[in-house]
Every structure is written in structure tokens, then in C-alpha cells.
Amino acid sequence: MSLKKSPFFELRSGSVDTLLFIVKTADLDALRAELVKRFEATPEFFADDVVAIDVRRLAGHERVPLDDIRGMLNDVRMRAIGVVAQPEQHAWAASAGLPLLEARDRRAPSSKAADEAPVQQAEPAAPAAGQAALFEQAGPTLADAGAPPESPAPAVAAQSATLVVDRPLRSGQQIYAKGDLVVLGPVSYGAEVIAEGNIHIYAPLRGRALAGVHGNHDARIFCTCLEPELISIAGIYRTTENPLPADVLGKSVQIRLEQEKLMIEPLRLT
């Protein structure tokens, strides 16, 4: 067999950036009701996003019909691409015809939706440790697509350069930064900015902003006009189905994590 590269295709090890849909109950009626409740008011937030169905939270004897769960996800316009399971769950998890994926968590604490966002004076961020939610935002290596095992990271990693975007971002556009991200123009509805570090937006944020996507709980989001579809730090997110308080909506703010909660605080610029 020739080892020469083909001009028509290549096969390479890689990884996929995806969400985990974490199944925590075998009660399909309860699961369906929660999905409807979560997304009936904001059906576009995860529209056409791909997800991996994670069944590792189920008890050893519990099984769920993955075809039914895949159908539920399709109903809210999310596409299941595989299953994450414990080794003892592999036999039945593979029966749905979805590939088994390996998940490598970057940090032990799991993510949860931020149901409340207190507004207060800035304080030092506290260490995060808590429960898990329906969804977790996964970093680019969370759902493995055949990538070889990663070698241990060095104790001190070189900091990635800051990415500066000096143009408006329109609906459908996405920016990804391996370090910090600075945006000098508006982030419109339907646009998305993602960073492994902090995000600074010196214009209105009306789309989605996701900071610390590899599990960096110390990441923050700063913007001069907060009107977002979604904000997220290390997978802990908040959408507009939970309205923002008047003293931060449309204002200059910083967003950080404190004990697994999103803290949204006005910036004192004067």
C-alpha cells in the first residue's frame, strides 16, 4: 500500500468540539418534560448543535432507550453523534447504532446552568466545585474522534497569544481563540465568540460568549453593553430565558464564576 498522500482525501486523528447531554434519570417522561421546559422559550440556542449522549450518571442497573433520547434531541434540533458510557455500559449503549466516544474531562467539577446571577461588588473569585447539569460545554478534546492519548501537560504552559478582532460579527459567524479574545465591534444576535481564556468585548454583546471552554474556571467575560443570547464560563451558562437584572442589562459588566455560579457585576468605569 502506498504511503503517499492522496490529493483527494486524508484520514487523520482528530477531535470534535461538542456538548454533552448528560442523562441523569431513566424516567423518559421526566426527561422529555424537562427538555420542553428548558427549550420551549428559547428554541434557537442549541439549534443544529451536535451532542454526545452521556449515560455515565445512570446507576449500574439502569438502561435507557437511546433511540428515544435521540428522537427527543431531534425534536429540539440537536443532533446526537455518539454515546459516552462506562465500560460496563458499552454493550447496551452501542445497541442504538451510535458510536461510542471517549470523554476526557479537563477538570473534575462538572458544569451546571446558572439559574441565578447575583449582582454585587467585585470580590476575588472563589474555587469552583459543585454539581453537574443537563448540559456541559465540552472543550475541543472532550468528545474523542480517534485522537491518540494526550501526553501530560507541562507544569507551566506557554500562554497563547491574545486574538484581536476589529470588525463586527454578524449572525452565523464564530470566532475561536486559544488564549484571550478581544472584540472591538458588536457581536450580533446569532454570532458566537469562544475563548479558552478571557473575553473582552468593547461593543454590544447580543450573541453568545463562551469563555474558559477548556474548563478554566478563572476565565472572565468583560463587555461594555450586555444584551446576550447566552453567556458561559467553563461550561456554566445562562440564557435569556432567565432575564438579566436591570442594573446589568445593557450596561458595562464583568462576568465571573464563584462557587459554580455566574456572577454578573457592573463595571465601575468612572
Curated annotation (Swiss-Prot):
Name the species this protein comes from: Burkholderia pseudomallei (strain 668)
Q: Which domain of life does the UniProt lineage start with?
A: Bacteria
Gene3D superfamilies the UniProt entry points to = 2.160.20.70, 3.30.70.260
List UniProt keywords, sorted A-Z.
Cell cycle, Cell division, Septation
Output the Pfam families linked to this UniProt entry: MinC_C, MinC_N
- Which gene is annotated as encoding this protein in its UniProt record? minC
UniProt keyword Cell division, yes or no: yes
Q: Where is this region: Disordered?
A: 105-129
Taxonomic lineage of this organism? Bacteria, Pseudomonadati, Pseudomonadota, Betaproteobacteria, Burkholderiales
The role this protein plays is: Cell division inhibitor that blocks the formation of polar Z ring septums. Rapidly oscillates between the poles of the cell to destabilize FtsZ filaments that have formed before they mature into polar Z rings. Prevents FtsZ polymerization.
Q: Tell me what this protein is called.
A: Probable septum site-determining protein MinC
Q: Which residues form a coiled coil?
A: none
Q: Where is the composition biased (Low complexity)?
A: 116-129
| GO terms (BP aspect) | cell morphogenesis; division septum assembly; regulation of cell division; regulation of cell septum assembly
Q: Which family does it belong to?
A: Belongs to the MinC family.
User: Which proteins does it associate with, and in what oligomeric form?
Assistant: Interacts with MinD and FtsZ.
Which SUPFAM superfamilies does the UniProt record give?
Answer: Cell-division inhibitor MinC, C-terminal domain
